[in-house]
Amino acid sequence: MRSGYTTVNFLPSAAGELSKVIAAVKLFHTDMTRLLVFSISLGTNDSAEEGPRGAPLYPEEYRTNIKAITDKLLDEFPGCKVVYQQPIWYSITTYNRSRYLAAGLARLQTYFPELKNLVAEYSQSKPGQVLMGDTEAFDYFKENYLTDLIPESGNAGTFYLHPNKKGAETLGKFWAEGIWNALSVN
């Protein structure tokens, strides 16, 4: 997937990104005895003050969109697992084509309880299918942005949003551990 997507881009619709994902999965996931796991990390672009499609999304809107995406995946692929990965930290100077800044970072953090609440709700209606993955990368990148995120020039000075090679490897490890731990419990 490309950078810059929001939950709005993935809402269920014939022309939406989720339809493309579903079509691709149906092409390669032909052995129904194999576990199918979807890892979702959306929210960074939703939190922007201005810019990406649909932004800014407030917590209840974010929750509604994540739920719609999850419901569609569970409907299309009964028995699949959906693992939510908490979005990562970005600097309060983040302002490229889109304006994030301090308000965006504060909004991003209001999404975290929404993800956890959805996991709790699905544990009643779809036990063991919707799980919480990584919740630690946010704090890691907040502490290690100088070594793990790319310094970029923006409208409010230097900002840190996108992982560099080291950061991408670290983020991949956080997500892999999040998936492993979520699936190990269930």
Model regions and ranges:
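Conserved SGNH/GDSL esterase-like catalytic core that processes O-acyl groups on lipids
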Residues: 1-64
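Surface-exposed intrinsically disordered loops and tails
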Residues: 6-19, 102, 129-133, 138-157
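Histidine-centered active-site loop/cap adjacent to the catalytic His
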Residues: 152-186
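Extracytoplasmic/secreted cell-surface and envelope-processing proteins
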Residues: 46-56, 91-99, 141-143
